[in-house]
Amino acid sequence: MKLAIVIPTYRKRNGEYKYQIAKTLESVSNQTHTDYKVFLIGDLYDDNDEFEELSRIIDPSKIWSHNLPIAYERSKYSGKELWVTGGVYASNIGIDQALKEGFDYICHLDHDDLWKPNHLELISTAIDETKTNFISTRSGKGWPVMESTEYLTKWRPLPSKVFKSTTCLNYKHFNIRFRNMIEEVNIVYASDADLWHRVNQLMVKNNEWGYVINESTMARLDSQFVIKNN
């Protein structure tokens, strides 16, 4: 199973994200499932040499990297408005490039999150077994909250109940992208929550189900590079 991984990123002025991003990319390079390609998009990462240095953490045959010339959302918004829109444009650039290169299934990974080495292997195996178009593992905090103890549980994504870095979607099937909710809908609402809502609607309409793998394979780094929720 070929899997694309979309990672939007930017550089904080104090430079602290460099080490978080490095850890994130190292967690990808350590995956037991190796049939993947990373699409790393800099949202005007303002130190291009550093951006290229980070890109080299991944095998050159397994990465497409592009540093955008403009910080799209960060040039327009701040505070909550930036929090709900940040990375939308960069993510969609990565999704479009992955589709152009023939990938159907695209996994998301934020630049301050980590995957356990078996994350992609579990994702790939579950897709092969279920033929689902949406798959998620559990996060370290237990999301999504589920009562089922089965290893694979039928489920449809819900806003605020999904960690983006646990998900993998068939974007060719859903034909969907992140929306800038402020510009496109005139609502200050998180773009990823909006995406899960629209995926849910499509799945209900088509009478299809996604699945959750009942295993935690994702963790988040805090500003001191300590895992917060493994």
What are these regions (language model features)?
Residues 140-148, 167, 210-230:
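Active-site donor/metal-binding and catalytic loop motifs
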Residues 36-45, 66-69:
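Short beta-strand/loop segment that forms part of the nucleotide-sugar
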Residues 102, 115-122:
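Acidic donor-diphosphate engagement hotspot in glycosyltransferases and nucleotidyltransferases
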Residues 121-149:
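Conserved donor NDP-sugar-binding/catalytic core segment of glycosyltransferases
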Residues 187-195:
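Acidic donor-binding loop at a coil-to-helix junction in glycosyltransferase catalytic cores
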Residues 50-99:
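Active-site-proximal specificity loops/subdomain of glycosyltransferases
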Residues 103-112:
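Short beta-strand-to-loop acidic/aromatic patch adjacent to the donor-nucleotide binding site
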Residues 23-35:
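Short, acidic, metal-binding catalytic loop of nucleotide-sugar glycosyltransferases
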